[in-house]
């Protein structure tokens, strides 16, 4: 990845990404976790070739994408964040997290592994090559995680240079933040309404567009290997890690948890 992720409050920034660098950055432990293999087990011989082939495919054909936009926070009003331009961002859990950390700004982020990998996984499935399709689908999911944490790390580094720190990210539909906030967050990154989505086969169905990502009326994103997130910006010195986020996450029965949830922990 090259180039900054953050930028002026009024501007969306999309860094230039190298698919080869992104593919190489996907951690083997995370990839195994998404394949349902114990983290420390290594890749069994039966899956090693397929896993490696998926990584090679993405390094050549993948189109990773990130966009981010920063917004100044005017105040936290109960279960909503009020931005300086008057926009209210709904979400009790997000508002509480930003209030606890005295956040003065919010960064809306969108990441995607790209439409190409979703199309290739679908093509392989349709060609009766389900194993190859599965490996590619899981690798694309690992790419999304990698992009989100990489964006967070770069944003954090830039914030620290300005005497600021990032509050751990939260996504609609996870961690107690309602999925209904998906459209609002999409717009905060820079998404705009588009023409009716004729390919959905539903009269009146529409999509909003943000780079290669589309938001459907249902709140779902296309391609499916995409995610939105919001991060608070504070002048309080805090440290958060992916493992720490998993320890505080209240999502029950998550098969992708990196470490066990702590029995007693103060949520950051």
Listing of model-derived features with the role each one plays in the protein:
Residues 55-58, 62, 155, 159, ...:
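Structural signal for hydrophobic packing residues in well-ordered secondary-structure cores
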Residues 42-46, 50, 136-139, 143, ...:
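Catalytic cores of large soluble enzymes that bind and process phosphate-bearing ligands
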Residues 173-265:
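Activity-critical C-terminal alpha-helical subdomain
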Residues 60-67, 148-149, 160-165, 255, ...:
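Intrinsically disordered or highly flexible coil/loop and linker segments, enriched in small
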Residues 103-172:
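Conserved mixed alpha/beta catalytic, RNA-binding, or beta-rich assembly cores of soluble enzyme
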Residues 122, 164, 259-262, 267:
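A generic "cationic amphipathic patch" detector
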Residues 2-3, 7, 11-133, 268:
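Active-site helix-to-loop segments that bind/position phosphate- or nucleotide-bearing substrates
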